[in-house]
Design a protein with these regions (language model features):
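Intrinsically disordered, low-complexity Pro/Gly-rich regions
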Residues: 1-20, 24
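Short loop/turn and low-complexity linker motifs enriched in small/turn-promoting residues
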Residues: 69, 80-81, 85-99, 103-354
Length: 354
């Protein structure tokens, strides 16, 4: 026999506690999120507004005027590394933007009287700057990236085009390669050859600013007095020895042909070579020039000519004769071009073909 148990109408259903726990958990999550927001957002925002060290505060402290002033001040104090950090990225060669080169510049042309106007613009602001380089006033315009804290305007440049094939120093700093352009700070720059036998032809010290860098004359090389002295020391004794030789081939790459164009023959050992006083003076005072493609190969071709006499034989007759350009090969009637490679430790004279 079975009985069906039924709940009485007066008893309410038993309530579940699951909803209560879910509600309490949601409240806890809200509280935790609120705390995180307060700690990270509100507090940091409050610090920034009150001059704290947040990123926005750092940006607000660096105005365009401040950045430009700090940049020029760093240059004026010889702090090249600090000044470079305030420049925007560049693909140009900056190997001359060193403390050594800058400090050398300041000994001749100090940067003084720095003044920067209030900026115009937004994140990239424009300021006018004035300063003096060695007492000479300079007025320039800088574009400043306020957000990045850098100067966007390109720096002055020093062009060394024309100085290829030889090591060059600028303010005592050796550059890896001449014949190119280098970024520099505004200032005074002394350009010199690292090889003592060569030097800059003309003015070697220039003041460079952004407005003047395009107007600097092209540099070129000439043989220094040390190079002239070395050339004469090496070349003149050899040339004189060749003049004194009685042989058809005296050396100096100026051998005579033993058979003249008119059929006469020259007797070896009877040749006399005589320079006039004018031509002797050319030899004694020769001034070489640097090579066009390889400047360390210095040379001279105007060493003077000379008169050539000797014993000539025609058929059965012999006698002294004088050689003229019309009756003998040109070679042997004058000194050929003499050259010397001053890049070598002990350079030797090379007598080239006429």
């Amino acid at each position: 026999m079975g009985y069906n148990m039924q709940q009485g109408p007066g008893l309410p259903p038993k309530k579940s506690k699951t909803g209560l726990w879910i509600g309490l958990g949601a409240v806890a999550v809200v509280v935790i999120v609120a705390l995180v927001l307060v700690l990270s957002g509100v507090f940091s925002g409050t610090n920034t507004a009150n001059g704290g060290e947040g990123e926005q505060a750092k940006e607000s402290k660096q105005s365009a005027k401040d950045i430009a002033t700090n940049y020029l001040t760093a240059i004026s104090e010889g702090r090249a590394d600090d000044a470079k950090k305030m420049l925007g990225p560049t693909s140009s060669d900056t190997s001359l933007m060193t403390n050594e080169a800058l400090k050398d510049s300041l000994t001749r042309a100090p940067i003084t009287d720095i003044s920067v106007t209030e900026p115009t613009g937004g994140n990239s602001s424009t300021v006018n700057v004035t300063y003096k380089v060695g007492g000479e006033p300079v007025n320039e315009e800088y574009t400043v990236n306020v957000r990045g804290g850098t100067i966007s305007t390109s720096t002055p440049h020093l062009s060394l085009y024309g100085l290829k094939g030889v090591d060059i120093t600028v303010n005592g700093v050796t550059v890896k390669e001449g014949d190119k352009s280098y970024d520099v700070f505004p200032g005074s720059y002394v350009v010199a050859s690292a090889n003592k036998y060569l030097e800059i032809d003309g003015e070697s010290t220039v003041v460079v600013t952004k407005s003047s860098s395009d107007n600097i004359p092209r540099f070129k090389l000439k043989v220094s007095q040390a190079g002239i002295d070395l050339f004469r020391e090496k070349v003149i004794p050899e040339a004189k020895a060749c003049l004194e030789s009685k042989n058809l081939d005296p050396g100096c790459n100026m051998a005579l042909n033993g058979t003249l164009r008119d059929g006469k023959t020259l007797e070896d050992g009877t040749i006399t070579r005589t320079q006039s006083s004018e031509n002797a003076n050319k030899l004694e005072n020769v001034v070489p020039e640097p090579g066009a493609s390889v400047p360390t190969i210095i040379s001279a071709s105007n060493l003077g000519s000379f008169k050539v006499t000797g014993i000539c034989t025609e058929s059965t007759r012999s006698g002294e004769c004088e050689l003229l350009g019309g009756f003998a090969a040109v070679k042997g009637m004058k000194f050929p071009k003499a050259s010397l490679n001053v890049a070598e430790e002990d350079p030797k004279v090379v007598w080239e073909d006429v």
